[in-house]
Amino acid sequence: VLTQHEVKIAPSTYYDARKRRPSARQVSDERWKPIVLGCWQRQRRVLGARKLWLRLRREGHDIARCTVERLMRELGIAGVRRGKRTNPVDADPRETRPADLVDRHFARFRTNQLWVADFTYVWSWSGWVYVAFVFDVHSRRILGWRAATRMTTPLVLDCLEMAFWTRRREGVADFAGLTHHTDAGSVYTSIAFTDRLIEEGIDPSVGSVGDAYDNSLAESQIGLYKTELIHHEGPWRNVDQVEAATADWVQWFNTERIHSSIDDLTPIELEQLEYALTEPLEQAG
Protein backbone atom coordinates (compact mmCIF):
# COMPACT_ATOMS: atom_id res chain seq x y z
CA VAL A 1 0.00 0.00 0.00
CA LEU A 2 2.81 2.39 0.88
CA THR A 3 4.64 1.79 -2.41
CA GLN A 4 1.43 2.47 -4.35
CA HIS A 5 1.47 5.95 -2.86
CA GLU A 6 5.16 6.40 -3.79
CA VAL A 7 6.31 6.07 -0.19
CA LYS A 8 9.80 4.57 -0.15
CA ILE A 9 10.41 1.89 2.46
CA ALA A 10 13.25 -0.58 2.71
CA PRO A 11 12.22 -4.25 2.41
CA SER A 12 14.08 -5.09 5.63
CA THR A 13 12.05 -2.47 7.53
CA TYR A 14 8.79 -3.93 6.23
CA TYR A 15 9.68 -7.51 7.12
CA ASP A 16 11.00 -6.50 10.54
CA ALA A 17 7.65 -4.86 11.28
CA ARG A 18 5.78 -7.96 10.14
CA LYS A 19 7.84 -10.18 12.44
CA ARG A 20 7.76 -7.82 15.43
CA ARG A 21 6.01 -9.39 18.42
CA PRO A 22 3.23 -7.51 20.26
CA SER A 23 4.43 -5.25 23.06
CA ALA A 24 3.85 -6.13 26.70
CA ARG A 25 1.16 -3.43 26.86
CA GLN A 26 -0.65 -4.83 23.83
CA VAL A 27 -0.60 -8.32 25.34
CA SER A 28 -1.86 -6.96 28.66
CA ASP A 29 -4.63 -4.99 26.95
CA GLU A 30 -5.89 -8.06 25.09
CA ARG A 31 -6.03 -9.93 28.41
CA TRP A 32 -7.90 -7.13 30.18
CA LYS A 33 -10.41 -6.20 27.49
CA PRO A 34 -12.77 -9.19 27.93
CA ILE A 35 -12.59 -8.79 31.72
CA VAL A 36 -13.46 -5.08 31.55
CA LEU A 37 -16.21 -5.64 28.98
CA GLY A 38 -17.69 -8.56 30.91
CA CYS A 39 -17.82 -6.60 34.17
CA TRP A 40 -19.44 -3.62 32.43
CA GLN A 41 -22.08 -5.88 30.89
CA ARG A 42 -22.81 -7.61 34.22
CA GLN A 43 -23.32 -4.21 35.83
CA ARG A 44 -26.18 -3.45 33.43
CA ARG A 45 -23.93 -1.47 31.03
CA VAL A 46 -24.39 1.71 33.07
CA LEU A 47 -21.12 2.24 34.98
CA GLY A 48 -18.58 4.87 34.06
CA ALA A 49 -14.82 4.41 34.38
CA ARG A 50 -14.51 5.18 38.10
CA LYS A 51 -17.28 2.88 39.32
CA LEU A 52 -16.27 0.15 36.87
CA TRP A 53 -12.69 0.35 38.16
CA LEU A 54 -13.94 0.05 41.75
CA ARG A 55 -16.11 -2.92 40.81
CA LEU A 56 -13.15 -4.65 39.13
CA ARG A 57 -11.02 -4.06 42.23
CA ARG A 58 -13.79 -5.56 44.36
CA GLU A 59 -13.68 -8.65 42.16
CA GLY A 60 -9.96 -9.03 42.83
CA HIS A 61 -8.55 -7.51 39.63
CA ASP A 62 -5.41 -5.42 40.15
CA ILE A 63 -5.93 -2.87 37.39
CA ALA A 64 -5.26 0.86 37.28
CA ARG A 65 -8.08 3.33 36.82
CA CYS A 66 -6.32 4.95 33.85
CA THR A 67 -6.13 1.53 32.19
CA VAL A 68 -9.88 1.05 32.64
CA GLU A 69 -10.52 4.50 31.16
CA ARG A 70 -8.31 3.78 28.13
CA LEU A 71 -9.73 0.32 27.51
CA MET A 72 -13.30 1.62 27.76
CA ARG A 73 -12.50 4.12 25.02
CA GLU A 74 -10.96 1.41 22.86
CA LEU A 75 -13.94 -0.89 23.45
CA GLY A 76 -16.38 1.90 22.65
CA ILE A 77 -18.25 1.61 25.96
CA ALA A 78 -19.21 4.32 28.45
CA GLY A 79 -21.40 4.97 31.47
CA VAL A 80 -24.88 6.41 31.10
CA ARG A 81 -25.47 10.13 31.62
CA ARG A 82 -28.30 11.49 33.69
CA GLY A 83 -30.91 13.80 32.25
CA LYS A 84 -33.08 16.43 33.90
CA ARG A 85 -36.26 15.32 35.63
CA THR A 86 -39.37 17.22 34.58
CA ASN A 87 -42.19 15.45 36.46
CA PRO A 88 -44.86 17.94 37.53
CA VAL A 89 -46.15 17.81 41.10
CA ASP A 90 -49.89 17.74 41.72
CA ALA A 91 -49.58 19.90 44.83
CA ASP A 92 -52.07 19.89 47.65
CA PRO A 93 -53.35 23.48 48.03
CA ARG A 94 -54.28 23.00 51.69
CA GLU A 95 -52.41 25.05 54.25
CA THR A 96 -52.85 22.30 56.85
CA ARG A 97 -50.42 19.80 55.34
CA PRO A 98 -47.53 18.62 57.59
CA ALA A 99 -44.59 20.95 58.13
CA ASP A 100 -41.13 20.49 56.61
CA LEU A 101 -39.16 18.83 59.43
CA VAL A 102 -36.07 18.21 57.29
CA ASP A 103 -35.36 21.65 55.78
CA ARG A 104 -32.92 20.06 53.30
CA HIS A 105 -30.62 18.87 56.11
CA PHE A 106 -30.51 15.28 54.88
CA ALA A 107 -26.96 14.59 56.09
CA ARG A 108 -27.77 14.79 59.80
CA PHE A 109 -29.86 11.61 59.78
CA ARG A 110 -28.61 8.06 60.34
CA THR A 111 -30.01 4.80 58.97
CA ASN A 112 -33.73 4.34 59.63
CA GLN A 113 -34.14 7.90 60.94
CA LEU A 114 -35.34 9.52 57.72
CA TRP A 115 -37.20 8.02 54.77
CA VAL A 116 -37.99 9.99 51.63
CA ALA A 117 -40.63 9.07 49.07
CA ASP A 118 -41.46 10.12 45.54
CA PHE A 119 -42.82 8.73 42.29
CA THR A 120 -42.14 8.99 38.57
CA TYR A 121 -43.84 8.43 35.23
CA VAL A 122 -42.79 5.78 32.70
CA TRP A 123 -44.26 5.78 29.21
CA SER A 124 -45.17 2.36 27.80
CA TRP A 125 -46.93 1.26 24.63
CA SER A 126 -49.98 0.54 26.78
CA GLY A 127 -50.02 3.97 28.43
CA TRP A 128 -48.44 5.64 31.44
CA VAL A 129 -46.98 3.58 34.28
CA TYR A 130 -46.48 5.23 37.68
CA VAL A 131 -43.67 3.94 39.89
CA ALA A 132 -43.43 4.98 43.55
CA PHE A 133 -40.41 4.57 45.84
CA VAL A 134 -39.43 4.85 49.50
CA PHE A 135 -35.72 5.37 50.24
CA ASP A 136 -33.65 5.40 53.41
CA VAL A 137 -31.76 8.69 53.22
CA HIS A 138 -28.60 7.62 55.00
CA SER A 139 -27.99 4.24 53.34
CA ARG A 140 -29.63 5.17 49.98
CA ARG A 141 -31.42 1.82 50.14
CA ILE A 142 -34.73 1.33 48.33
CA LEU A 143 -37.06 0.00 51.02
CA GLY A 144 -40.30 -0.05 49.08
CA TRP A 145 -41.53 0.42 45.53
CA ARG A 146 -44.69 -0.25 43.56
CA ALA A 147 -45.86 0.22 39.95
CA ALA A 148 -49.39 0.83 38.68
CA THR A 149 -51.31 2.36 35.79
CA ARG A 150 -52.91 5.03 38.00
CA MET A 151 -51.32 7.49 40.42
CA THR A 152 -53.43 7.10 43.55
CA THR A 153 -53.11 7.20 47.32
CA PRO A 154 -53.43 3.37 47.50
CA LEU A 155 -50.33 3.10 45.28
CA VAL A 156 -48.11 5.12 47.63
CA LEU A 157 -49.67 3.42 50.65
CA ASP A 158 -48.79 0.03 49.17
CA CYS A 159 -45.23 1.26 48.63
CA LEU A 160 -45.08 2.41 52.25
CA GLU A 161 -46.35 -0.96 53.49
CA MET A 162 -43.56 -2.66 51.54
CA ALA A 163 -41.03 -0.44 53.34
CA PHE A 164 -42.54 -1.43 56.70
CA TRP A 165 -42.34 -5.10 55.70
CA THR A 166 -38.69 -4.74 54.64
CA ARG A 167 -37.65 -3.29 57.98
CA ARG A 168 -39.79 -5.61 60.10
CA ARG A 169 -38.31 -8.62 58.33
CA GLU A 170 -34.92 -7.38 59.57
CA GLY A 171 -36.08 -7.05 63.15
CA VAL A 172 -37.30 -3.44 63.38
CA ALA A 173 -40.34 -3.50 65.64
CA ASP A 174 -40.84 0.19 66.39
CA PHE A 175 -40.82 3.12 63.95
CA ALA A 176 -41.10 5.82 66.61
CA GLY A 177 -38.59 8.59 65.95
CA LEU A 178 -38.59 8.01 62.20
CA THR A 179 -39.39 10.92 59.86
CA HIS A 180 -41.04 10.33 56.48
CA HIS A 181 -40.43 13.20 54.02
CA THR A 182 -42.11 13.89 50.65
CA ASP A 183 -42.93 16.75 48.33
CA ALA A 184 -46.32 18.46 48.51
CA GLY A 185 -48.05 16.06 46.11
CA SER A 186 -51.68 15.42 46.94
CA VAL A 187 -51.24 11.63 47.26
CA TYR A 188 -48.66 12.15 50.02
CA THR A 189 -50.65 14.78 51.90
CA SER A 190 -53.90 12.81 51.82
CA ILE A 191 -55.56 12.08 55.14
CA ALA A 192 -55.25 8.30 54.64
CA PHE A 193 -51.50 8.49 54.01
CA THR A 194 -50.79 10.86 56.89
CA ASP A 195 -52.91 8.80 59.28
CA ARG A 196 -50.97 5.64 58.36
CA LEU A 197 -47.68 7.31 59.24
CA ILE A 198 -49.01 8.59 62.55
CA GLU A 199 -50.41 5.13 63.33
CA GLU A 200 -46.84 3.77 63.19
CA GLY A 201 -45.46 6.62 65.29
CA ILE A 202 -43.75 8.23 62.29
CA ASP A 203 -43.43 12.00 61.92
CA PRO A 204 -44.75 13.14 58.50
CA SER A 205 -42.76 15.89 56.78
CA VAL A 206 -43.68 17.71 53.56
CA GLY A 207 -41.55 20.13 51.54
CA SER A 208 -42.77 23.41 50.08
CA VAL A 209 -44.71 23.63 46.83
CA GLY A 210 -42.68 24.05 43.65
CA ASP A 211 -39.23 23.65 45.23
CA ALA A 212 -37.44 20.53 43.98
CA TYR A 213 -34.59 20.99 46.46
CA ASP A 214 -36.89 20.21 49.39
CA ASN A 215 -37.04 16.57 48.25
CA SER A 216 -33.83 16.55 46.24
CA LEU A 217 -32.50 13.26 47.54
CA ALA A 218 -35.56 11.31 46.42
CA GLU A 219 -35.47 13.05 43.05
CA SER A 220 -31.78 12.20 42.69
CA GLN A 221 -32.45 8.53 43.41
CA ILE A 222 -35.31 8.44 40.91
CA GLY A 223 -33.01 10.14 38.41
CA LEU A 224 -30.71 7.13 38.67
CA TYR A 225 -33.68 4.81 38.10
CA LYS A 226 -34.73 6.69 34.97
CA THR A 227 -31.16 6.88 33.62
CA GLU A 228 -29.93 3.39 34.46
CA LEU A 229 -33.09 1.45 33.69
CA ILE A 230 -35.98 3.25 32.03
CA HIS A 231 -34.14 5.30 29.40
CA HIS A 232 -31.35 2.76 29.07
CA GLU A 233 -33.39 -0.40 28.50
CA GLY A 234 -36.69 0.86 27.04
CA PRO A 235 -39.03 1.09 25.22
CA TRP A 236 -41.53 -0.64 27.49
CA ARG A 237 -44.59 -2.64 26.52
CA ASN A 238 -46.76 -2.41 29.63
CA VAL A 239 -46.86 -2.19 33.42
CA ASP A 240 -45.96 -5.86 33.84
CA GLN A 241 -42.69 -5.43 31.95
CA VAL A 242 -41.82 -2.26 33.86
CA GLU A 243 -42.60 -4.00 37.16
CA ALA A 244 -40.41 -7.03 36.39
CA ALA A 245 -37.49 -4.90 35.24
CA THR A 246 -37.81 -2.59 38.25
CA ALA A 247 -37.70 -5.53 40.65
CA ASP A 248 -34.46 -6.71 39.05
CA TRP A 249 -32.94 -3.21 39.08
CA VAL A 250 -33.88 -2.59 42.73
CA GLN A 251 -32.16 -5.81 43.78
CA TRP A 252 -29.02 -4.78 41.88
CA PHE A 253 -29.19 -1.21 43.20
CA ASN A 254 -29.37 -2.29 46.84
CA THR A 255 -26.81 -5.10 46.72
CA GLU A 256 -24.30 -4.30 43.96
CA ARG A 257 -24.37 -0.64 42.92
CA ILE A 258 -21.72 1.34 44.79
CA HIS A 259 -22.39 4.97 45.77
CA SER A 260 -19.71 7.62 46.15
CA SER A 261 -21.92 9.41 48.72
CA ILE A 262 -21.57 6.45 51.13
CA ASP A 263 -17.84 5.82 50.71
CA ASP A 264 -18.18 3.58 47.64
CA LEU A 265 -20.30 1.01 49.47
CA THR A 266 -23.60 -0.51 48.42
CA PRO A 267 -26.69 0.36 50.50
CA ILE A 268 -26.83 -3.13 52.01
CA GLU A 269 -23.11 -3.06 52.84
CA LEU A 270 -23.46 0.25 54.68
CA GLU A 271 -26.40 -0.98 56.75
CA GLN A 272 -24.64 -4.24 57.60
CA LEU A 273 -21.50 -2.35 58.60
CA GLU A 274 -23.44 0.00 60.86
CA TYR A 275 -25.33 -2.90 62.41
CA ALA A 276 -22.05 -4.72 63.11
CA LEU A 277 -20.63 -1.61 64.79
CA THR A 278 -23.69 -0.77 66.91
CA GLU A 279 -24.64 -4.28 68.05
CA PRO A 280 -21.66 -4.68 70.45
CA LEU A 281 -22.44 -1.25 71.94
CA GLU A 282 -26.08 -2.21 72.54
CA GLN A 283 -25.04 -5.49 74.16
CA ALA A 284 -22.55 -3.70 76.40
CA GLY A 285 -25.18 -1.18 77.43
Where are these regions (language model features)?
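Charged DNA-binding/catalytic regions of mobile-element recombinases
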Residues: V1-G285
